[in-house]
Amino acid sequence: MQGPMKNTVADFWKVVWQQHSHVIVMLTKIKEGGNEKCHQYWCPYEDNLLVTEEYTIKTLRVTVRPNYIRTFLEITDKTTQRSRKITHFQCLHWPEHSMPSDLAWFIDFIKMTNRVRKAVHEDILGRFQRVF
């Protein structure tokens, strides 16, 4: 899935809700080489909210590791008040225009995201850089 831009953040969260996603994996940074790759579609700080017309997304907890950031989110449908927990992984060290020289850390990252996915019995919603 392509990362959302500012005008498509609400649509992104609608897809997350409709697909019953519990895990989001982001392989790029928000900005690379000074260019915005996608809009910051979640709040990076605990207890902050992102509000769209249909959903409220609350950041519950943020864990920073050397190669990734793991953010625990809760999305709530404003109409039904139903909510769901989401784990968001942002990979920090994927090179902008190439493959990593050492893939051991990335293999560990994949294994860890798969453990989380299997725990909630859901597919992963991948977020990659925008395609022009």
UniProtKB/Swiss-Prot annotation:
Pfam families: Y_phosphatase
Domain Tyrosine-protein phosphatase: residue ranges: 1-132
InterPro entries attached to this UniProt entry: Prot-tyrosine_phosphatase-like, Protein-Tyr_Phosphatase, PTP_cat
GO MF entries: protein tyrosine phosphatase activity
Superkingdom of origin: Viruses
Alphabetized CDD domains for the sequence: PTPc
Family: Belongs to the protein-tyrosine phosphatase family.
The name this protein goes by in its record: Tyrosine phosphatase-like protein N2
